[in-house]
Amino acid sequence: MKQKFSSMIDRYTHQQLRIGLVSPQQISTWSKKILPNGEIVGEVTKPYTFHYKTNKPEKDGLFCERIFGPIKSGICACGNYRVIGDEKEDPQFCEQCGVEFVDSRIRRYQMGYIKLAYPVMHVWYLKRLPSYIVNLLDKPLNELEDLVYCGFYFARPIDKKPTFLRLRGLLEYEIQPWKYRIPIFFTTRSFDTFRNREMSTGGGSIRQQLANLDLRMIIDYSLVEWKELEEEEPTGNEWEDRKVGRRKDFLLRRMELAKHFIRTNIEPKWMVLCLLPVLPPELRPIYHIDEDKLVTSDINEIYRRIIYRNNTLTDLLTTSIATPEELIISQEKLLQEAVDALLDNGICGQPMRDDHNRIYKSLSDVIEGKEGRVRETLLGKRVDYSGRSVIVVGPSLSLHRCGLPREIAIELFQAFVIRDLIRKHLASNIGVAKSQIRKKKPIVWEILQEILDDHPVLLNRAPTLHRLGIQAFLPILVEGRAICLHPLVCKGFNADFDGDQMAVHVPLSLEAQAEARLLMFSHMNLLSPTIGDPISAPTQDMLSGLYVLTSGNRRGICVNRYNPCNRRNYQNEDNNYKYTKKKEPFFCNAYDAIGAYRQKRIHLGSPLWLRWRLDQRVIAAREAPIEIHYESLGTYYEIYGHYLIVRSIKKEILYIYIRTTLGHIYLYREIEEAIQGFWQGCCNSMLPAGIRVSPG
């Protein structure tokens, strides 16, 4: 028994979880088990849970101990006890009640099944988008729904046999004259034989159509039709062209779906259920609050309705001879609706409710959503070596770095710090090392920073919808309690700085650290894996910052000077509005302008004149200056809208100044450094080994 449980949770044996289709034989294998006396159990046939007097599970019910195992380890329903795993104890099951003497944990994974009296459609593959059954059968969804819920009949094609019905496909038996004309030619039994032979409805008709599909022929025919549509030229009619485009997209989806079925060895008819799995009892518990009160899972109540309706349909099909067809069809529809409520309550209309008008919680509700089993229990559970905090912007960080608060870092990397303290003989044992960490000695932070320089961490923001939701960073210690993040990586996380929280995880094994370095670093995930567009692009706060940085007095000097709102900026001591150099300073280079800003002599958006090397061919010859100022030495200034030319007496160009702001200078320098770094990296990659291009 211990080996059986260890194999269930072995991480090397079970490394992934996949939701997909299984065959009825596989469901039977999961559920059936052979008792030591040769009896086969596993089918749930009774809609009962516990006996109201003995408070024990009903035999062949939803909590049957013969099917799902004992409630208490080694104790059968009769109360007898056997030592688990003792081969000397014989027999290994109770001959009176048929319960095996095994560990009670078996009730957490042992499944049962319900043998359906009539095939039932799996609603996920019919109503969810995209509808796989619609894609395979190439029929409208409303027609298939009418067929599944017994609103239409399907005329069966019978090969090499004489048929009464010459039509093929759907027929509405209830409205058309078939209902009154066909039975005239038959007796009651003969008509039942004819109807079962040439007409079908419900999930059985869908199952028959899916079983008759040839997936390879579907691929061939779809490919031929797609090529024919591709060769057609546009008609000019927008509606017709869109219709052709939708048909081509449908054919591509159909071919991909057929290829997937062939590649995974899945048969399409498995989308119609003949055996309905019953979850283990521990996953749908029932609790006793008081002596008279029980609290049970909604899934148990839905299972009970399914068993009631299935047993009723079985009786109608087997025991009753002259049962009206309408009654059988109605019961098949009720069974289909009950299974729909179990899988996805409310997807097909009005949801199933209890006596207090409360909607039952289906399997889809248990699995999906933020509070579902996957996101809350499997993905959102607390794990060791992980933390969580609010994110704030870190504009000075490199793209592959993040700021980790000291309080979080010392907790996550405490084991690593203790190891290094002992290895460097700074602490004699673990207790002394922990004492130094509690006292926050300076040597602790030095060792911690050394560890962080070579150990990546993983940052994750829920929900993790694609692989860029988890990325690797090299952490640096920061003050405060918030995680600092570079704004360029926010798009991959779909994060912003309005209170979002992110989780930090420490990869422990060498394999995990290698994967983080080779595949998950943020500077290695610059493009979207789906469409190839840049994922590290300025958004939100960065765009606002760039706007503020370059939103100084960007308009030309003429517009600013003669604008009444800006006249006070140019008014001099003589109360006129002519140009004066005192208002807008001149700088020989960008370093002088930055120095003046640091000395608080100018502002970030203040207009200024910067000496610039400008190609004279760029200057328009026909452009006339706005003003010309002459100096006492003969030099003069030609002032244009966005630049200024200093000429000598001989009209030679001495200097050229451009009108800009300090924000534009900062942005230009960043772009220039980035281009130079990119060019240097490209040159180094093309040069032979040992030769490198130095900056400058």
Curated annotation (Swiss-Prot):
GO terms for cellular component: chloroplast; DNA-directed RNA polymerase complex; mitochondrion. The keyword ATP-binding does not apply. Zn(2+) binds at C76, C78, C94, C97. Binds 1 Mg(2+) ion per subunit. Binds 1 Zn(2+) ion per subunit. Mg(2+) binds at D496, D498, D500. Its cofactor is Mg(2+); Zn(2+). Its EC number is 2.7.7.6. GO terms for biological process: DNA-templated transcription. One of its GO terms (molecular function) is DNA-directed RNA polymerase activity. It comes from the Eukaryota. It is an enzyme of class 2 (transferase). Keywords: Chloroplast, DNA-directed RNA polymerase, Magnesium, Metal-binding, Nucleotidyltransferase, Plastid, Transcription, Transferase, Zinc. It catalyses: RNA(n) + a ribonucleoside 5'-triphosphate = RNA(n+1) + diphosphate. It is found in: Plastid, Chloroplast. Its main location: plastid. The keyword Lipid metabolism does not apply. InterPro entries: DNA-dir_RpoC_beta_prime (IPR045867), RNA_pol_asu (IPR000722), RNA_pol_N (IPR006592), RNA_pol_Rpb1_1 (IPR007080), RNA_pol_Rpb1_3_sf (IPR042102), RNA_pol_Rpb1_clamp_domain (IPR044893), RNApol_RpoC1 (IPR034678). Belongs to the RNA polymerase beta' chain family. RpoC1 subfamily. In plastids the minimal PEP RNA polymerase catalytic core is composed of four subunits: alpha, beta, beta', and beta''. When a (nuclear-encoded) sigma factor is associated with the core the holoenzyme is formed, which can initiate transcription. DNA-dependent RNA polymerase catalyzes the transcription of DNA into RNA using the four ribonucleoside triphosphates as substrates. PANTHER family: DNA-DIRECTED RNA POLYMERASE (PTHR19376), DNA-DIRECTED RNA POLYMERASE SUBUNIT BETA (PTHR19376:SF68). This is DNA-directed RNA polymerase subunit beta'.
